[in-house]
């Protein structure tokens, strides 16, 4: 991907609203997808995107280790918007092998185990989800982590060979919750119990 193109898109969208950023990509590109963990930020983006395009692609990764509340919010989202979020699962044989070699919670035992688990449960399904995608929309915010402070609105993701868009990059947590309350967006009840994402 041409760095100059990404820089030009960032300049063009610099002072645009989140809705305008999303509209830009939905209208200028064919294969646009939101990856949703069903966390608050992703629910905001789901609402914004589906208000613009009821047929937009939204997917999630079911690692096999999700809380029941996550399935509840997925169901509530599907019902509210009349959609079906695409769900990508890990390869069952690889998960079974992971269990046989590391046990149920082997990912807690070492960094190598954690990386292996993450690769099987998250990275491989994400690769399948992004296979034909041109633009990957995420719910990442700069305020979530020091590693995200300098993250641009639009970037090229070399690992997945896709344009990655972070429309909420400058949002604060209060902005997310204001939007959810104002627009009656379904959210994961784990947030009420102190879970950040």
Model-derived regions: residue spans:
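Nucleotide-activated chemistry modules centered on ATP-dependent adenylation/adenylyltransferase
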Residues: 1-197
């Amino acid at each position: 991907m041409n760095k100059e193109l990404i820089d030009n898109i960032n300049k063009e969208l610099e002072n645009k609203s989140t809705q305008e950023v999303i509209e830009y990509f939905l209208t200028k590109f064919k294969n646009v997808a939101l990856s949703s963990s069903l966390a608050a930020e992703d629910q905001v983006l789901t609402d914004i995107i589906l208000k613009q395009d009821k047929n937009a692609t939204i997917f999630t990764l079911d690692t096999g280790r999700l809380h029941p509340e996550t399935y509840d919010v997925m169901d509530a989202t599907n019902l509210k918007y009349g959609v079906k979020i695409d769900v990508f699962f890990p390869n069952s044989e690889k998960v079974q092998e992971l269990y046989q070699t590391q046990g149920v919670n082997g990912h807690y035992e070492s960094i190598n185990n954690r990386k292996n688990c993450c690769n099987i449960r998250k990275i491989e399904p994400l690769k399948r989800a992004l296979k034909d995608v041109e633009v990957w929309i995420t719910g990442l915010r700069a305020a979530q982590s020091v590693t995200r402070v300098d993250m641009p609105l639009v970037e090229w993701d070399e690992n997945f060979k896709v344009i990655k868009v972070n429309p909420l990059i400058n949002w604060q947590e209060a902005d997310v919750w204001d939007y959810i309350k104002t627009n009656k967006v379904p959210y994961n009840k784990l947030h009420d119990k102190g879970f950040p994402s």
